[in-house]
């Protein structure tokens, strides 16, 4: 096997637990409710915080990868992912589990752009790169699909923390393999990080989701829910305007005028909702 395909296998190995963790808790709600005494709202945050934080952190982590090199980003993200998995497995309360899942998402947000950058730099030929990207997408979809199955099997035979604890040995093996196999990419120190904009985006997403959950459950006064929603919308508007005016934005908003990209985004949103 050529070094290119060995590199791809190493990259895909670290991506598998990232994909599985997006859905592994979908069957764990009753178990978590009993084990941690968590409320319905806390259960929703335990499940959703991973995707929400990851969505806001992927873009700045891609910029961080440009600054430090994507191999370093991959190894750092894997280490954070493993530590967060251990913290999640040992969480004594719902709030500590939510915090651990948020940290888990930070590690995942480092891994995702690092794997894509690794594929792009490893495969110079377009046909091979397209095949590698197809395998990457298949691993992501397959991991998310198998997440509930993996979670169900582990919960049936072990305690609830095993759905996170299983990540630790996988991450240790993956770090060792990637440190040896994945080639080092050159860093671009001039790439802006825009951490403030990333934090604003995360805050906007969390505020909008929190207001939607609160409105459905009626836990807050209507005026307070509306205020949180308006705050989130204002932050999101500020973020979009910053991207439109920046010389080197984190997101090129003009991409959303492309029909293929826009239709893909809409399909992804529809799939996530249903």
Q: What are the residue ranges of the model-derived segments?
A:
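12-transmembrane solute porter fold
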Residues: 4-20, 25-27, 40, 222-231, ...
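C-terminal membrane-cytosol helix-exit motif in multi-pass small-molecule transporters
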Residues: 168-187, 202-214, 230-246
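Helix-loop-helix hairpins in multi-pass membrane proteins, especially solute transporters
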Residues: 66, 70-196
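Short hydrophobic/small-residue motifs within alpha-helical transmembrane segments
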Residues: 51-52, 141-142, 268
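Hydrophobic alpha-helix/TM-entry signal in multi-pass membrane transporters
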Residues: 4-11, 74, 81, 97, ...
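Extracytoplasmic
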Residues: 3-51, 56, 111-112, 116
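Small-residue-mediated transmembrane helix hinge/kink sites in multi-pass secondary transporters
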Residues: 30, 62-63, 116, 151-152, ...
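A membrane-interface helix-boundary motif in multi-pass transporters
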Residues: 156-168, 212-225
